[in-house]
Curated annotation (Swiss-Prot):
EC number(s) on file: 6.1.1.11
This protein's record includes keyword Amino-acid biosynthesis: no
Gene assigned in the entry: serS
Superkingdom as given in the UniProt entry: Archaea
Identification of the protein by name: Serine--tRNA ligase
One Pfam family, short name: tRNA-synt_2b
CDD domains: SerRS_core
């Protein structure tokens, strides 16, 4: 939600930002907001004038009564004023609703460093890490995707896709999950279950070491939390509703964490508030028909460890960089080659002022795929959820800035581990950082196993 004062004081900035985002149909909204706002302020001014006049009449009525003079004319006039005030208050309320309709549907103002573009093809890679394993048939494409800025090892044998590795390793059952729940669901089995849990504890431990408070949030939230955290379009495309209840299954722990301090004034000395949450996530994935229909990359249900920060406005951009660095460190420990991408205006979404994605190299697929998103939402969520802070009790509260970043979405991290650490025979080596959590150092194909999860 945007600050109405920003639109009053700098409407051209807002219009230009909408143009950069490709939201051309909303540019006319700004003039309409200004027109409604001017009318709203005029009516408020008239209400205040009438209240002042009514107070003067009340004083005059008191004087006349004391003097034994008639007051009927003044009482009639006061009654008319009260009636007019009531009418104006209704008009003001209606104008406020119309203004809020637009304010609640406008995207955040982008940071100047966000590249202008139409879609994901215009996102800008800003750094690369690791030594990629590249099948010779993918080499030309890899060199283009990595801009020649990444070390690589050419493989003569073709790496398998994660969905095929899961079958070879006995790690998932998609057919029975489809029977029970439909498409984009899965049963995880055997060592992959332990790997999923290991990734959760690994990410939690690393972030707790950095001062984050661990949280398991509610897995369902009320509508006001979702409305405050995301866009209305997500209610159709992403979020599952519980029938007959004012409850929604969370698509990410970001949302219950954003709602955690709704309608609160925080003590400035407590900022920043650093949270790391574990939760399952539930997503409709509407509008993704035909994309990643096999495997566990794009699914309706998955586990995720999420970073979330409540920050002072002047510190939020520093925290944005720190959050993405935290996630990078996790993937470096997992020995997953990746690139960090600055997301362009057309792919940014409404909530974030700036977003970085970490995209892991997937040798089986021969391309980089998103595994982390890190966003600075500035005060967009805080205004909708009314989250403020102050340093002194006599100080006017200010809105906090909220930031979020994936630490690890386990299903996508598993995809990256399987594809990057596979051997030619289908065995998958477990990254050293996870050994103490898994209790085993590799996963071997089913035909070579003597039992699950052997060291």
């Amino acid at each position: 939600m945007l600050d109405i004062n920003l639109i009053r004081n700098n409407p051209e900035l807002v219009k230009n930002d909408l143009k950069k985002r490709g939201e051309l149909d909303k540019i006319a909204w700004i003039d309409e907001i200004l027109r409604l706002d001017e009318e709203w302020r005029k009516k408020l001014k008239e209400i205040n004038r009438l209240r002042h006049e009514r107070n003067k009449i009340a004083i005059e009525i008191g004087k006349r009564k004391k003097a034994g003079e008639p007051v009927e004319d003044l009482l009639a006039k006061s009654k008319e004023i009260v009636k007019r005030i009531e009418e104006l208050e209704k008009e003001v309320e209606e104008l406020r609703k119309r203004i809020d309709y637009y304010l609640w549907r406008l995207p955040n103002i982008t940071h100047p460093s966000v590249p202008v573009g139409k879609d994901e093809n215009d996102n800008v890679p800003i750094r690369f890490w690791g030594k990629a394993k590249v099948w010779k048939g993918h080499l030309e494409s890899f060199l283009e995707q990595s801009q020649g800025k990444m070390e690589y090892e050419v493989l003569e044998w073709r790496p398998k896709l994660h969905v095929d590795l899961l079958e070879i390793l006995g790690g998932a059952d998609f057919a029975r999950a489809a029977k029970v729940s439909g498409s984009r669901f899965y049963y995880l089995l055997n060592e992959i279950v332990i790997l999923d849990l290991a990734l959760i504890r690994f990410a939690l431990d690393r972030l707790i070491e950095k001062g984050f408070t661990p949280v398991i949030p509610p897995y369902m939230v009320r509508r006001f939390v979702e409305e405050g955290s995301t866009t209305f379009e997500d209610f159709e495309d992403v979020i599952y509703k519980v029938e007959g209840e004012d409850l929604y299954l969370i698509p990410t722990a970001e949302h219950p964490l954003a709602g955690m301090h709704a309608n609160e004034i925080l003590d400035g000395k407590d900022l920043p508030l650093l949270y790391v949450a574990f939760s399952p996530c539930f997503r409709k994935e509407a509008g993704t028909a035909g994309k990643d229909t096999k495997g566990i990359f794009r699914v309706h249900q998955f586990h995720k460890v999420e970073q979330f920060v409540y920050s002072r406005p002047e510190e939020s951009w520093e925290w944005h960089e720190r959050l993405v660095r935290n996630a990078e460190e996790l993937f470096q420990e997992l020995e997953i080659p990746y690139r960090v991408v600055n997301i362009c205006t057309g792919d940014l979404g409404y909530v974030a002022a700036k977003k970085y994605d970490i995209e892991a190299w997937m040798p089986g697929q021969g391309r980089f795929r998103e595994v982390v998103s890190a966003s600075n939402c500035t005060d967009w969520q805080a205004r909708r959820l009314n989250i403020r802070f102050r340093d002194r009790t006599d100080e006017k509260p200010r809105y906090v800035h909220t930031l979020n970043s994936t630490a690890i979405a386990t299903s996508r991290a598993i995809v990256a581990i399987l594809e990057n650490h596979q051997q030619e025979d289908g065995t998958v080596k477990i990254p050293r950082a996870l050994w103490k959590y898994t209790g085993f150092k590799e996963i071997v194909p089913v035909e070579k196993k003597e039992g699950c999860c052997k060291a």
